[in-house]
Swiss-Prot record:
Changing C131A: Can grow on sulfide-only medium. GO terms for biological process: methionine biosynthetic process. Belongs to the L-aspartate semialdehyde sulfurtransferase family. This is L-aspartate semialdehyde sulfurtransferase. Changing C54A: Loss of activity. Cannot grow on sulfide-only medium. It comes from Methanosarcina acetivorans (strain ATCC 35395 / DSM 2834 / JCM 12185 / C2A). PANTHER family: CBS DOMAIN-CONTAINING PROTEIN CBSX2, CHLOROPLASTIC, L-ASPARTATE SEMIALDEHYDE SULFURTRANSFERASE. One of its GO terms (molecular function) is transferase activity. The active site is at C131. It is an enzyme of class 2 (transferase). Its EC number is 2.8.1.16.
């Protein structure tokens, strides 16, 4: 039986006799020596991850101006920071987007620009007080001008993350990257074998006060992260570190098309091998870490699981999905994760980094709750018009014109002989056909690619689809494509009027 203490390991770090390996190397060591042998041989295992961590931000202090100002609103390079703190304290979120450049530039870019030594435009406003009389401030600053610049990240270093795919017929732009139609690709995130929390799944050595590698400098875990869900192996960490000591090699801003900005963070955690149980945990392989592939075509919180896979399958470059070979790609960098684990290994090996035990362990049970919503989410069936005029595809344009005139309705659902939706015809389509002397069947002038929605779909999703494609109405259909009604922009406008 092997038992060590952190004090004993730190003495070895101090005298240079410590044996430190990466989590990737530990797999082979346990295979060759067994768990007990590995626990005797190895003192520290280093881990690493480098990925998009949206829930990150910078806590900063600007120092007092002359005359002084109690900042109410604050912008850095036209990116707004939260300033509802003391006079010149502020928090800049990585995902906050620019007022002028939109999602191409955001809080993450401001943070990286600061780290790279660039000068920032600062604009601040206030209501003015006797002790803080100034109302407007414009200046330029660099990182060196700030009293404090503490990277304070509410949720980083997920233990693992669900992969993503897309069953719809169009490209989806998401925080999981670009998802191609018809299950065209799978994207995933996480370092697998090098993942810090996957190498200590019971959080024996990782918790409040643990010293870590953060953005190229030493940082600390200050507790579990938001949405910490240990019961489903989706643990998270809340971290802090001094931005002034970090490196842009391990902190990079990014913008995801159609989604927004994020901050790529490099995190590494050393795990002291105190006993055989911890040694066994640090021998986890990609094959041992499973996650679900979710369908992002469903615009709902609870997305359907398409398949369960392990990280070895994801990292192989392709998996079988819906009967075909589907490419996989990572949004995080395993190359950088490996680089972090190796750099941390060198720090420990050369006495530049000492391991520490948490003053309080992370919770091992529990899961994140969904938002409490006091107002029912309106569904399409709640606002749709259940009276809809239909026409057969083999009827004439004159028949269609007569139906629109008799019913004062601008949209006709075109159905087959068995009642399935096959197209849609509008008053504009009929006017165009008449102008071009086309009096053939409805099928020759109808729109065949019809946007539709389901009765139990949230109205918000239907409204987004109407707006995206610039149409004013969509037929509501069941699973057999039978027409149940129609939802129009007018229906949605009336709903909003009732809400507000």
């Amino acid at each position: 039986m092997v038992e060590k203490s952190v004090h004993e390991i730190n003495k070895k770090i101090e005298d240079g006799s410590v044996n430190v390996v990466t989590a990737e190397e530990m797999v082979g060591i346990v295979e060759n020596l067994g768990v007990e042998g590995a626990a005797r041989e190895v003192d520290v295992v280093t881990t690493g991850t480098f990925g998009a961590m949206c829930s990150s931000g910078l806590m900063l202090n600007l120092g007092h101006s002359e005359p002084p100002i109690k900042i109410q609103k604050l912008w850095f390079n036209n990116v707004e920071a939260y300033s509802g703190l003391a006079a010149v304290d502020a928090y800049l979120g990585a995902a906050q987007i620019s007022d002028t450049r939109g999602i191409q530039y955001g809080g993450a870019h401001v943070i990286e620009d600061l780290l790279r030594g660039k000068e920032l435009d600062v604009h601040a406003t206030s209501y003015g007080t006797d002790c803080y009389p100034r109302k407007v401030l414009d200046t330029r600053i660099t990182l060196d001008d700030l009293n404090e610049a503490v990277l304070l990240n509410p949720r980083n270093a997920y233990q693992k993350y669900a992969a993503a795919t897309n069953s719809s017929k169009r490209i989806l732009n998401t925080y999981m990257g670009e998802l191609l139609p018809n299950f065209g690709n799978v994207t995933y995130s996480g370092a697998g074998v090098l993942s810090p929390l996957s190498n200590d799944p019971d959080y024996e050595t990782i918790g409040m006060g643990t010293r870590i590698f953060m953005g190229g400098a030493q940082g600390y875990i200050i507790g579990n992260g938001t949405q910490h869900s240990p019961s489903s192996s989706f643990g998270t960490l809340m971290l802090k570190g001094n931005l002034k000591e970090m490196s842009s090699d391990y902190l990079r801003a990014a913008s995801f098309a159609g989604y927004g900005t994020t901050l790529y963070m490099g995190i590494g955690i050393p795990i002291p091998i105190l006993n055989e149980k911890i040694a066994a945990s640090t021998a986890v392989r990609d094959e041992d870490i499973f996650t679900d592939i979710l369908d992002y075509a469903v615009g709902s919180r609870d997305k359907p699981v398409i398949k369960q896979v392990n990280y070895a399958e994801l990292r192989s470059g392709s998996i079988e999905l819906e009967g075909k070979n589907t490419p996989t790609s990572s949004l995080s960098s395993f190359k950088n994760a490996r680089k972090i684990a190796n750099e941390l290994k060198e720090w420990v090996k050369h006495g530049k980094f000492f391991v520490s035990m948490p003053v309080e362990k992370l919770s091992r049970e529990g899961s994140a709750k969904s938002m409490k919503q006091t107002q029912a989410v309106p569904l399409v069936k709640d606002v749709m018009a259940d009276f809809i005029v239909t026409i057969k595809k083999n009827q004439t344009v004159q028949d269609a014109a007569k139906k629109i005139w008799e019913n004062s309705f601008n949209h006709l659902a075109v159905v087959s002989d068995t009642g399935e939706l096959v197209g849609i015809l509008t008053a504009w389509d009929i006017s165009k056909a008449v102008a071009e002397n086309i009096f053939d069947s409805v099928e020759s002038v109808m729109t065949k690619k019809v946007l539709t929605c389901a009765p139990n779909e949230p109205v918000d999703l239907a409204a987004r689809r109407l707006d995206r494609y610039g149409v004013s109405a969509m037929p509501v259909i069941d699973t057999q494509r039978k027409v149940l009604g129609i939802i129009t922009s007018d229906n949605i406008s009336k709903l909003l009027a009732r809400r507000y």
